[in-house]
Structure formats: structure tokens, C-alpha cells
């Protein structure tokens, strides 16, 4: 998504989270999945977390930088549509496995993906199933300073904070799609997707005044 001209993404703990279209705020753009509007997982904003949907589940990304007349008029910035994997024209299978290690959290990371699709009954019935699992412990640390101006007009440091963040994100996603070709001009389609995400975050702060 970030490689598209006019699109910027906001990061959280090294992962892309929000998409901005044409420099507007993320809450001024709509995010849909297969054309269906996604609500925000946060109660006090319209921002939609793009990292809720794993990349293994997405086939294409459609971006409209201008809302057209056939779209909901609730997005000044534009629209981002995530298209999930559809049934293939022939049998296909793919599996991915990855791991890593985060030195700050001192924990291992795991990423698994599975996709299978095929057609049955003389290619009239198509099926696609996709499963994704990710467990990604991470961490970050920094030092933050606060300055003020004293009575002499001098800029002085009034506070220093040493912060550490330990984050574990676990994602589980399941996608299932069917289609049935009634004739060359008509097709029935059934799609479903289930996503589950957990975030655990520990914050530590030491303040010097």
C-alpha cells in the first residue's frame, strides 16, 4: 500500500497501521473489505487499523483517491478496498513459514500461512481456504526530555524519561470462499472471513526531575 503514489502509512511499533490518502488524516478515508465498510476497532476515532487483516488474506488492494458517485459519501480523503483471495481457475496450494528473534524482548517470532484452492464438478464449483497465524513479540526503548524557559529566559531541561515498551501481537485469520457457475453469465459467490487479534503491551518508565 505504501508504494502507491499519494498514499502514506502511519506506523506503530514498526508495523503499518493507518493509511492516509492524498495527505489527509486517516480518519477522513474509508476502508472496505470486498466493498463492505470496516468499522474502527477503537471507540474514539474513525481510523481503521489496516494491520487487522494479514497480507496472506489479501489478493489485491484498490485505492480510490476521489470518492465517486457510486460510493458512500463519508470519506473526504478517499477509499481503500482490500480484496480477499478468490477461488482459482485451477488447483493451487501454497504454504509459508517464517520465524525471527527480537533482541529487545528476547523472544522468538512466528509467522505461518496456508492457502488452498480448487474447482470441482467440471469446474462449476470453486473453493478457496486461507489460514494465517502470527505471533510477533517486539519492543522498543527511548529517552525523552522536557524543556522549559526559566525566569532568566534560559532554556533548561526540567525532566528526563527513560521508557521501555514490550509488545506481543498475536493474529489469527481464517478465510473461506465458494463460487458456483450457473452459466457463463451468472455466478453465485459466498465469502467469509474471521480475524482475531490480541495485543499485550507492558510499559516501563523512569522519570528524572
State what each model feature region is.
Residues 9, 19, 36-66:
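Short acidic/polar hinge/loop motifs at secondary-structure boundaries
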Residues 42, 58, 89-97, 150-159, ...:
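Flexible, solvent-exposed coil segments and beta strand-coil junctions
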Residues 30-32, 60, 92-96, 126-128, ...:
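Residue-level detector of the transmembrane beta-barrel scaffold of outer-membrane proteins
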Residues 71, 101-103, 163-165:
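Outer-membrane beta-barrel domain signature
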Residues 107-206:
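Transmembrane beta-barrel wall of Gram-negative outer-membrane proteins
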Residues 64-66, 83, 96-102, 132-134, ...:
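Outer-membrane beta-barrel pore domains and translocons
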Amino acid at each position: 500500500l505504501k508504494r502507491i503514489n499519494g498514499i502514506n502509512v502511519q506506523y506503530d511499533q514498526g508495523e503499518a497501521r493507518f493509511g492516509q490518502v492524498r495527505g489527509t488524516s486517516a480518519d477522513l478515508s474509508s476502508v472496505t473489505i470486498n466493498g463492505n465498510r470496516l468499522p474502527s476497532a477503537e471507540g474514539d476515532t474513525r481510523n481503521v487499523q489496516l494491520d487487522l487483516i494479514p497480507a496472506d488474506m489479501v489478493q489485491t488492494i484498490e485505492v480510490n483517491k476521489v470518492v465517486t458517485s457510486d460510493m458512500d459519501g463519508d470519506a473526504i480523503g478517499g477509499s481503500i478496498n482490500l480484496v480477499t483471495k478468490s477461488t482459482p481457475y485451477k488447483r493451487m496450494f501454497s504454504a509459508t513459514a517464517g520465524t525471527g528473534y527480537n533482541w529487545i524482548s528476547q523472544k522468538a517470532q512466528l509467522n505461518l500461512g496456508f492457502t488452498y484452492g480448487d474447482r470441482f464438478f467440471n469446474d462449476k464449483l470453486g473453493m478457496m481456504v486461507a489460514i494465517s497465524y502470527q505471533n510477533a513479540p517486539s519492543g522498543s526503548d527511548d529517552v525523552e526530555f522536557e524543556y522549559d524557559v526559566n525566569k532568566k529566559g534560559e532554556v533548561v531541561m526540567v525532566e528526563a524519561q527513560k521508557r521501555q515498551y514490550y509488545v506481543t501481537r498475536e493474529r489469527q485469520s481464517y478465510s473461506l470462499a465458494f463460487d458456483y457457475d450457473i452459466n457463463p453469465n451468472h455466478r453465485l459467490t459466498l465469502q467469509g472471513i474471521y480475524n482475531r487479534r490480541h495485543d499485550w503491551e507492558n510499559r516501563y518508565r523512569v522519570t528524572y526531575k
